[in-house]
Amino acid sequence: MDDKKTWSTVTLRTFNQLVTSSLIGYSKKMDSMNHKMEGNAGHDHSDMHMGDGDDTCSMNMLFSWSYKNTCVVFEWWHIKTLPGLILSCLAIFGLAYLYEYLKYCVHKRQLSQRVLLPNRSLTKINQADKVSNSILYGLQVGFSFMLMLVFMTYNGWLMLAVVCGAIWGNYSWCTSYSPEIDDSSLACH
């Protein structure tokens, strides 16, 4: 019974230390893992390599202009250097621009598919067009969610790249939207 109580105490202390260090940010890495158990043989884990923290993705919960160790949506898209930041911003700018182009293509396609039925204001769309419209809609929603996730890095440079790409894309592909076309979507952007 003593072993269970001691193990529980050590586990709770370790959990408390992890929560405290991650929430308050006092420690970026653990210098040692030397946990002495009272009344039992100690376990010394100080020889374990925990990494130096240089290659870990940071997750900002507040707005930041820092770019080092920022991961963009995927673990493999890891910004470590200034050139990496610049290339990432250009890629994100391009993605936001392409999103606006996709919106333009969807709108243009919807306008071209409109065939008025006699004496009605309804439109008739064939099955193949419904399938392709649904696929394009899915791409549009997926694209917008990816851009939302980029924005949720809270990195000022990446957020600026999304906004600038959207501005330039809207300027390049802006159309006068027809009120008859339903523009409601799940798009986050």
From Swiss-Prot:
GO terms for molecular function: copper ion transmembrane transporter activity. Keywords: Copper, Copper transport, Ion transport, Membrane, Transmembrane, Transmembrane helix, Transport, Vacuole. Residues 103-142 are vacuolar. It holds the Pfam family Ctr. Residues 1-81, 164-189 are cytoplasmic. Homomultimer. This is Copper transport protein CTR2. The lineage of its organism: Eukaryota, Fungi, Dikarya, Ascomycota, Saccharomycotina.
